[in-house]
C-alpha cells in the first residue's frame, strides 16, 4: 500500500576538484578533459565542467548544487571525457556516488580510481546541508516514489499586424513530460508538467531567429496567478506571453502497491462460492467448505502458436467434462495460449456452457486458407488502421502490423473486443480470472537474459509486480508521467495486445515480409524459415537484410513502422517515477530482481519513455510468474505445457529461476525414465515448504492415447491411425510456425489433449483433495 508523506529537501553541493594521471585518448596531444554530472532525481539534464586543454592532471575546482530528497535513491553519475571535436568525445572514467551515504551536515572528499590497476584518479568533494523549506509531498510503496508536479500553462498571442502562421516558435521546459513543443503563434495553450521543486525555466525562441529568446524561471512565478510578459525582439514586440503555474493533482492514476487490486479481491470473494460448490461435488464432501478451507487453484498455459491455442481448447473441454473447471480461480496464458483465452472471454458465460460451439469455430479458423491475409484490400485496411493509431498518439512499430495480420489469421473479421470488456465475464465469479503475460526488455542494448521484467495483463489491471505499479487495463497505452495520467488514448482492441503477447512469431513474419513482393513469395519464405527451425529455438532478433533490388510488401508500411521491428513500443506508465532509498532491500523488489541493472536505479524502466514488450518465450515459455506472488496464495497449479522439445524443459527453467530468486516452488526433478518416456501427468510438490504450490504437469505427449480413444475404451484396428499423433519437433504438423492445420491434424490434437486430461481424473481429484487438506492444516486452532 502506498504511503504519502511530506519530505523536506537537502542541498547537495558537489565540487569537482581535479584529476590525476588521466590517460590520453589522443594519439599526439595530452587530454582535453571535462566532467559531466547527472543526478536525475534533482535535475533533468547533465551538468558539465569547463574543458581543461592539454593536461593529464586537469584542475577544475567547480561547484554544482542539487536539491535532493533523502527519501529518494540519489545516485549521481560522474563521467570524465576527453574532448575530440573531430571523432567525438572519448569516455575516460565513469563512477557512481550514492548521496544517501552522506549525513546531513557532513562534508566528504572522495578520490575515485580509474580502475583497480590504473593510476588515474578523480577527486570530488561532497557536502550535504538540510534546508528549511516547506517540503514536498511524496507518495511511495517502498520501491517507487511519486513526487509533486507543477503544471505550467502558456498562451501566446501576437501583438502586431503579423500573421501568426508566419512565426513558428519553440517552447522548452527541460525535464518536462511534454518535452520541446513547436507551434505557430496564437495556436492555443501549451502545458508543461515537471517536478514542483525542480528549479526549471521556460525558454521560448523563434525558429527563424534563434538568438531571440525569452527565459522565465518557474520558481519566480506565483502559483495560481496569471503573469503577462512581452516577447523581446530586436525590432518590436512580437507576441504577448501569458503564464500560469498551478499545482498538479496529488491523486495518482498509477496504483503503487503490491498484491491484488480491490477489484480482483472482490472477484475472488465471488469466485470462492463457485469453487466451493464445485469442490463439494467433485470430491463428494459431506458438508460445505469454510471460506479458509477453499484452495486457490490455477491453470498455467504455455505458448506454442496454433498448437497451444488448439491444445488449450481440448484441455479446458476435458476439465469441463470432469466438472473441475469451476474449481479454478485463475488461468494464465502466454503467447499462443492467449489467443484461446481472448476468444473464449468474448462470451461472458463461456465456462458455464458446452465448449463444442467455440471448438467448432476454432477448427474453422485453424483449417482455413490464410493467403487472403495479404490480399491488397487487407493490406490497405492494415495501413489505414495503423495510420489512425499513429494519429491518435500511439507509437508505431512492427508488432502492430503483426497484430493485425495475426487477427486476420485467427478471425474472418476484425473484432472490437477489448481487454477491459472481459470484466463482464467476471462480474459474478462465473469464470476464472485470466492473466496474460509479457516481458519488458531494454531493446537491442541487452538480451532478455540480461534484462527481462515480467509484466502482467488482466481485465482489471496491467502492471509490474517487481515495482508494485499498476494501471487500469483501459489506460494501457495512454501517456503517464510521475504517476499522473497526461493524455488518455482510446483503449486498443485486444488484437494489439495479442500482438504483444505472441510477437515471438513476428521475427519469422518480418523476415518474410521484407523479402516478399507478393503473397506467394511471402508464404514460400515463411515455409523455408520454418524448415530451418527444427528444434523450435527462439529466433534471433537480427534479421537478414534482403538485396536492395528485392521487392518488399513491407515497403507499403515503411512510413508507419518507425520503431524497433520486434519490440512493442508502448508509452511507459512508469515514466518519471523515482526510486525509494531502500528499494533494493524491499522484499517484493528483491523477489523479482533478476537483471544486470537492478542495482542501477537511473537505468531501470522508469527512466525510459517507452516500454519494450515482448513475448515471454524470449526468456522462459511460461505464464506461471503471476501465480507465484505470495499475495495470490495459489495452492495448486495445473501446468499445461505445449512444448515439442522437452516435456520438462521449460518447467525446469522456471524451477531454477524460482530457486535463484528465493520464490517458493517445488523442485522439478523428473527421473531419467520420466525424461525419456514422459507420462500424461506428473505431480511435483514440496511438503517441507508450505509456501510452495503443488504442480500437476501435463506435457504434450501421446502415451496411452495410441491405444485408447477414451479412458478405458481401447481402439479398434480401424481407429489405430487416429491414435498416431506426430509430436516430433523436427517434422511435426504442429510446429509453431504452422498457421494452417489439416482437419485431421486439428481433430487429433483436440482429442489427444482432451483425453490426456480425462484419463488422469483420479490424479486431478487427489491433487484437489491435497489442496483442501493443506488449507485445513493452515487454519488457526
UniProtKB/Swiss-Prot annotation:
Tissue and organ distribution: Widely expressed. Expressed at higher level in brain, heart, liver, cerebellum and pancreas.
Pfam families for the chain: C2, cPLA2_C2, PLA2_B
Residues annotated as catalytic: 335, 615
Domain (PLA2c) ranges: 246-781
This protein's record includes keyword Membrane: yes
Catalysed reactions, as listed in the record: a 1-acyl-sn-glycero-3-phosphocholine + H2O = sn-glycerol 3-phosphocholine + a fatty acid + H(+)
GO MF term list: calcium ion binding; calcium-dependent phospholipase A2 activity; calcium-dependent phospholipid binding; lysophospholipase activity; phospholipase A1 activity; phospholipase A2 activity
GO cellular component, one term: mitochondrial inner membrane
Protein keywords: Calcium, Cytoplasm, Endosome, Hydrolase, Lipid degradation, Lipid metabolism, Membrane, Metal-binding, Mitochondrion
Enzyme Commission number: 3.1.1.4, 3.1.1.5
Record-annotated C2 domain positions: 1-112
InterPro entries: Acyl_Trfase/lysoPLipase, C2_cPLA2, C2_dom, C2_domain_sf, cPLA2_C2, LysoPLipase_cat_dom
Result of altering residue 615 to A: Abolishes enzyme activity
Domain of life: Eukaryota
GO term, biological process aspect, one: inflammatory response
Entry cofactors: Ca(2+)
Residues where Ca(2+) 1 binds: 26, 32, 82, 84
Residues holding Ca(2+) 2: 26, 82, 84, 90
SMART domains: C2, PLAc
Major enzyme class: hydrolase
PANTHER family found in the cross-reference section: CYTOSOLIC PHOSPHOLIPASE A2, CYTOSOLIC PHOSPHOLIPASE A2 BETA
Record text about domains: The N-terminal C2 domain associates with lipid membranes upon calcium binding. It modulates enzyme activity by presenting the active site to its substrate in response to elevations of cytosolic Ca(2+).
Protein name as annotated: Cytosolic phospholipase A2 beta
Organism: Homo sapiens
GN (gene name): PLA2G4B
Amino acid at each position: 500500500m502506498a504511503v504519502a508523506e511530506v519530505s523536506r529537501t537537502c542541498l547537495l553541493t558537489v565540487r569537482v576538484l581535479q584529476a590525476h594521471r588521466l590517460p590520453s585518448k589522443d594519439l599526439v596531444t595530452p587530454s582535453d578533459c571535462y566532467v559531466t554530472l547527472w543526478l536525475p532525481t534533482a535535475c533533468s539534464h547533465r551538468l558539465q565542467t569547463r574543458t581543461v586543454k592539454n593536461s593529464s592532471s586537469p584542475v577544475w575546482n567547480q561547484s554544482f548544487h542539487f536539491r535532493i530528497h533523502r527519501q529518494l535513491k540519489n545516485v549521481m553519475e560522474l563521467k570524465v571525457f576527453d574532448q575530440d571535436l573531430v571523432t567525438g568525445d572519448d569516455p575516460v572514467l565513469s563512477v557512481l556516488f550514492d548521496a544517501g551515504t552522506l549525513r546531513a551536515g557532513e562534508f566528504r572528499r572522495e578520490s575515485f580510481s580509474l580502475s583497480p590497476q590504473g593510476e588515474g584518479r578523480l577527486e570530488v568533494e561532497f557536502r550535504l546541508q538540510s534546508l528549511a523549506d516547506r517540503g514536498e509531498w511524496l507518495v511511495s510503496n517502498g520501491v517507487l516514489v511519486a513526487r509533486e508536479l507543477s503544471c505550467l500553462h502558456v498562451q501566446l498571442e501576437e501583438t502586431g499586424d503579423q500573421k501568426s502562421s508566419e512565426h513558428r516558435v519553440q517552447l522548452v521546459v527541460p525535464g518536462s513530460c511534454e518535452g520541446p513543443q513547436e507551434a505557430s503563434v496564437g495556436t492555443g495553450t501549451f502545458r508543461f508538467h515537471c517536478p514542483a521543486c525542480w528549479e526549471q525555466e521556460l525558454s521560448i525562441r523563434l525558429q527563424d531567429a534563434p538568438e531571440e529568446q525569452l527565459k522565465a524561471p518557474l520558481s519566480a512565478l506565483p502559483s495560481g496567478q496569471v503573469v503577462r510578459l512581452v516577447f523581446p525582439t530586436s525590432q518590436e514586440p512580437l507576441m504577448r506571453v501569458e503564464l500560469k503555474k498551478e499545482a498538479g493533482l496529488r491523486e495518482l492514476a498509477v496504483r503503487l502497491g503490491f498484491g491484488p487490486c480491490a477489484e480482483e479481491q472482490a472477484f475472488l470473494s465471488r469466485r470462492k462460492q463457485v469453487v466451493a460448490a464445485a469442490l463439494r461435488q467433485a470430491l463428494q464432501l459431506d458438508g460445505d467448505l469454510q471460506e479458509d478451507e477453499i484452495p486457490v487453484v490455477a491453470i498455467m498455459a504455455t505458448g506454442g502458436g496454433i498448437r497451444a491455442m488448439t491444445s488449450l481448447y481440448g484441455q479446458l473441454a476435458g476439465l469441463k467434462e470432469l466438472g473441475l473447471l469451476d474449481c479454478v480461480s485463475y488461468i494464465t496464458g502466454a503467447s499462443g495460449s492467449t489467443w484461446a483465452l481472448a476468444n473464449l472471454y468474448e462470451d461472458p458465460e463461456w465456462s458455464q456452457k458446452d465448449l463444442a460451439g467455440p471448438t467448432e469455430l476454432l477448427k474453422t479458423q485453424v483449417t482455413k486458407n490464410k493467403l487472403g491475409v495479404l490480399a491488397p484490400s487487407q493490406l490497405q485496411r492494415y495501413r489505414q488502421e495503423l495510420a489512425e493509431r499513429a494519429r491518435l498518439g500511439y507509437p508505431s512499430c512492427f508488432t502492430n502490423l503483426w497484430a493485425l495480420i495475426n487477427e486476420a489469421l485467427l478471425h474472418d473479421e476484425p473484432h472490437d473486443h477489448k481487454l477491459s470488456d472481459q470484466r463482464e465475464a467476471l462480474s459474478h465469479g462465473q469464470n476464472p480470472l485470466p492473466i496474460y503475460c509479457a516481458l519488458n526488455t531494454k531493446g537491442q542494448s541487452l538480451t532478455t537474459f540480461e534484462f527481462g521484467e515480467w509484466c502482467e495483463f488482466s481485465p482489471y489491471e496491467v502492471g509490474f509486480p517487481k515495482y508494485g505499479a499498476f494501471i487500469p487495463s483501459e489506460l494501457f497505452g495512454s501517456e503517464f508521467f510521475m504517476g499522473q495520467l497526461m493524455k488518455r488514448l482510446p483503449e486498443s482492441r485486444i488484437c494489439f495486445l495479442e500482438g504483444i503477447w505472441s510477437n515471438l512469431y513476428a521475427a519469422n513474419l518480418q523476415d518474410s515480409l521484407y523479402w516478399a513482393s507478393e503473397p506467394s513469395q511471402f508464404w514460400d519464405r515463411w515455409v523455408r524459415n520454418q524448415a530451418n527451425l527444427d528444434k523450435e529455438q527462439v529466433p534471433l532478433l537480427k534479421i537478414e537484410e534482403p538485396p536492395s533490388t528485392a521487392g518488399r510488401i513491407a515497403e507499403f508500411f515503411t512510413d508507419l513502422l518507425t520503431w524497433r521491428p520486434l519490440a512493442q513500443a508502448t508509452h511507459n506508465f512508469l515514466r518519471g517515477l523515482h526510486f525509494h532509498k531502500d528499494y533494493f532491500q524491499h522484499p517484493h523488489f528483491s523477489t523479482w530482481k533478476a537483471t544486470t541493472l537492478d542495482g542501477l536505479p537511473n537505468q531501470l524502466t522508469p527512466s525510459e519513455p517507452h516500454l519494450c514488450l515482448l513475448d515471454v518465450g524470449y526468456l522462459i515459455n511460461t505464464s506461471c510468474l503471476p501465480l507465484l506472488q505470495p499475495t495470490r496464495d495459489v495452492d495448486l497449479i495445473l501446468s499445461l505445457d505445449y512444448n515439442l522439445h522437452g516435456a520438462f524443459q521449460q518447467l525446469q527453467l522456471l524451477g531454477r529461476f524460482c530457486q535463484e530468486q528465493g520464490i517458493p516452488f517445488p523442485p522439478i526433478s523428473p527421473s531419467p525414465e520420466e525424461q525419456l518416456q514422459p507420462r500424461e501427468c506428473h505431480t511435483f510438490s514440496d511438503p517441507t515448504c508450505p509456501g510452495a504450490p503443488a504442480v500437476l504437469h501435463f506435457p504434450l505427449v501421446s502415451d496411452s492415447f495410441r491405444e485408447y480413444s477414451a479412458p478405458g475404451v481401447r481402439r479398434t484396428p480401424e481407429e489405430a491411425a487416429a491414435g498416431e499423433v506426430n509430436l516430433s519437433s523436427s517434422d511435426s504438423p504442429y510446429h509453431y510456425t504452422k498457421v494452417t492445420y489439416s482437419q485431421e491434424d486439428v481433430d487429433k490434437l483436440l482429442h489427444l489433449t482432451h483425453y490426456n486430461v480425462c484419463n488422469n481424473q483420479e490424479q486431478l481429484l487427489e491433487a484437489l483433495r491435497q489442496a483442501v487438506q493443506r488449507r485445513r492444516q493452515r487454519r488457526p486452532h
